[in-house]
Amino acid sequence: MVDNARAARMAKRIQTIVASAIEREIKDRRLEYITITDVTMTGDLHDATVFYTVRGENVGDEPDLEAAAEALHRARGQLRKIVGEQLGVRFTPTLTYRVDTVPEASAHMEALLERARQRDAELAKLKENAVPAGDPNPYKSDTREEDEA
């Protein structure tokens, strides 16, 4: 039987443990710029997927995704041991690491929304000077014409 609430609690706890272990216990310079963004658990609580993002050393620098992935791969045993010790469950879940693509997707979505806003502003400018083709209100009827007919 799947207990989604327990899986969610365990995922949140694993996220906290892994993030603090990377920050405080694992001494690898390639892990300095990693942020753990989310953890998902399977229903049987045997597998956890850890999502992470990597930022560059400086604001304008490109992140080194391969080095970060290699560092996480090399530290996976130590991280699993730390998670097992701090989690206190019978079976320590297997940890799989995946790059989180949500920031890139949201940046792309923001760019699309900005483009739509610019087009709306252009249309609003065109609409200000627009004149209807024909009568200003084609549905308005002149009552005098109807009375004479």
Curated annotation (Swiss-Prot):
Main location group: cytoplasm
Disulfide bonds: none
PROSITE patterns noted in UniProt: RBFA
Subcellular location per the Swiss-Prot or TrEMBL entry: Cytoplasm
UniProtKB keywords: Cytoplasm, Ribosome biogenesis
Description of how the protein assembles with itself and partners: Monomer. Binds 30S ribosomal subunits, but not 50S ribosomal subunits or 70S ribosomes.
Descriptive protein name: Ribosome-binding factor A
Gene name, Swiss-Prot/TrEMBL: rbfA
